Design a protein with these regions (language model features):
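C-terminal motif of bacterial Sec signal peptides marking the signal peptidase cleavage site
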Residues: 16-18
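Catalytic cores of phosphodiester-bond hydrolases, prominently lipid phosphodiesterases
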Residues: 22-89, 93-380
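Sec-dependent signal peptide recognition
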Residues: 2-11
Length: 380
């Protein structure tokens, strides 16, 4: 009888605590995109200005020179060496080519105005931070940057998805000083220019976009993208490995123009930073880390925030914004300092401030929206 009772006890244990426990059979690949957290880089393409250009900017806009004193290595290095899985690329409209070939700020530092860079003569979107004075970049064209991402992705097909945030820019020196003349005048990002973003992505990733996660992939046959993501509709990590997805950094009129004619982003490639309550809302850009981010994350939105800005934290060593960004559950925590500024070793103006996930993980289970099963495990 005792042996029979033992068998019954074992059987009941299996029934109630083993075989039917779905959590025990869950794997990391079953986590959804909104259930992880990664480190991102800000203005990821950017090379710091030369000393001479920095000094020129400081002579008329010292605060701007202070804010711009950072740079990044190649995207491939960011992905492989530092585990970055979210990047940001600024693009300017240049349908005829040559708009940014001349770097007119060079006139004031004794450098040639004509860049001599052939890629800048070709038609298409250009990658830079600011015409004439802050133009140094690892990738002159958007297509060059996309190829760099795709090539790395093809060589590392098991990577968790990379999110690329795109800012459509129109800024120039005239934006700072309207009375100035003779400098580059960027073009407006109208509907044609916004369509060019999608077209150039397709030119690199193919018309079928097999490697790209699009709003249509998430929305399916539903009328509202937001309703899908608020009901657990993001794809799993396993379904998304080796893929890329894109977001539009801009709000306001630029965002509205991108959405116009594409309800719930039907047919579009970029997720937009749209307001909760709209049919296209899925990705939120909340640059200032606050505790309220957790509320949006727990609802199902994917959020990008910043751990630092304008070099302030790297100079002061203040880790408060970084720590709040990480604990908020924002899926993308963007920084200029996934490695400390090298000048910290030789200058009192800089600290060893840096941003990484606990354990230097590439990705971790989200502290707010995760399942609770993999908090101590690295995800990649």
């Amino acid at each position: 009888m005792q042996q029979i009772n033992t068998y019954i006890s074992i059987y009941l244990s299996l029934v109630f605590f083993g075989c039917d426990n779905n959590e025990d059979s869950m794997t990391i690949d079953d986590l959804k995109l909104n259930q992880i957290q990664v480190i991102g880089s800000h203005n990821s393409y950017r090379i710091n200005t030369t000393v001479d250009m920095h000094n020129l900017i400081a002579s008329f806009q010292p605060d701007l020179a202070h804010d711009l004193d950072y740079g990044h290595p190649l995207l491939e290095t960011q992905f492989s060496q530092y585990g970055i899985r979210q990047i940001e690329i600024d693009v300017y409209h240049d349908p005829e080519g040559g708009l940014f070939y001349n770097q007119r700020g060079n006139l004031f530092i004794g450098m040639p105005v004509a860049s001599g860079i052939e890629e800048l003569l070709s038609p298409g979107l250009k990658v830079l931070h600011f015409p004439d004075i802050d133009y140094r970049t690892h990738y002159y064209t958007f297509i060059d940057a996309l190829h760099a991402v795709k090539n790395w992705s093809d060589q590392n097909p098991n990577h968790i998805p990379i999110f690329i945030l795109i800012e459509a820019k129109e800024e120039s020196l005239s934006s700072l000083y309207p009375s100035l003349s003779g400098f580059t005048q960027p073009l407006t990002f109208d509907n044609t220019a916004l369509d060019a973003i999608d077209a150039e992505i397709r030119s690199v990733f193919g018309e079928n976009l097999d490697k790209v996660i699009t709003p249509d992939d998430i929305r399916g046959d539903n009328e509202s993208l937001e309703s899908v993501i608020l009901n657990g509709g993001w794809p799993t990590i396993g379904e998304s490995r080796g893929k890329i997805y894109f977001g539009l950094d801009n709000g306001g009129a630029t965002r509205d123009a991108y959405v116009s004619g594409h309800p719930a982003l039907a047919g579009r490639i970029l997720f937009t930073a749209s307001d909760p309550g709209t049919s296209e809302a899925a990705f939120l850009k909340l640059n200032t880390p606050t505790e309220s981010i957790s509320d949006f994350v727990s609802q199902g939105y994917i959020v990008r925030t910043r751990a630092d800005a304008d070099t302030e934290e790297a100079r002061s060593g203040d880790t408060g914004p970084r720590d709040l960004a990480l604990s908020s559950g924002a899926q993308f925590v963007s920084t200029d300092y996934y490695v400390a500024d090298a000048r910290a070793d030789t200058s009192e103006d800089w600290t060893n401030y840096s941003v990484s996930l606990p354990g230097n993980f590439i990705a971790r289970e989200n502290p707010v929206s995760g399942s609770g099963n993999f908090f101590d495990m690295e995800i990649e």
